[in-house]
């Protein structure tokens, strides 16, 4: 297995929260020899230099192995060169686009975002004892979030905001 936890601790990296998609993936996969788990969303949001990250973790890479990872950040494409350098050839991403299955030899697979309002006990009281198949749903959507056009892959959020 690729022991990244020591690096995460040493360099004070952390899993993003409350949307802990990468952390949940890490907890499920950390014992798999080919899983390369790092908090990519934090690396992006904290603007860590990718060359620095590469130099910190490259000793963990066995060039004979092909690794996989999970990235929950919408700007995942910026990591492609780093992932290639780390021999990561498969990435589970939360912002998978239909028809984009490979970028520069890296396979992209979908991974659901951690649903904070459902998965976290302190937020999910409204969902207890609900028959999700048959319940009437008077609300079309319950999450809008922010709208920063430069950050999104499509204009769906603009359409949601236009409906309000």
Language-model regions, residue ranges each:
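Nucleotide-sugar donor-binding catalytic core of glycosyltransferases
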Residues: 1-164
């Amino acid at each position: 297995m690729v022991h990244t936890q020591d690096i995460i601790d040493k360099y004070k990296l952390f899993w993003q929260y409350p949307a802990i998609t990468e952390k949940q993936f890490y907890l499920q996969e950390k014992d798999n020899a080919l899983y390369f788990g790092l908090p990519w969303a934090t690396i992006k949001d904290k603007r860590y230099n990718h060359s620095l990250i590469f130099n910190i973790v490259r000793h963990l890479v066995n060039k004979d192995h092909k690794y996989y990872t999970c990235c929950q950040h919408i700007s995942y494409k910026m990591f492609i060169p780093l992932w290639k350098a780390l021999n990561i050839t498969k990435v589970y991403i939360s912002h998978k686009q239909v028809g984009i299955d490979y970028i520069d030899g890296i396979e992209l697979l979908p991974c659901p975002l951690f649903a904070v309002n459902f998965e976290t006990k302190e937020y999910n009281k409204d969902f207890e004892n609900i028959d999700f198949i048959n319940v009437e749903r008077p609300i079309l959507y319950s999450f809008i979030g922010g709208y920063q056009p430069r950050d999104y892959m499509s204009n769906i959020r603009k359409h949601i905001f236009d409906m309000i």
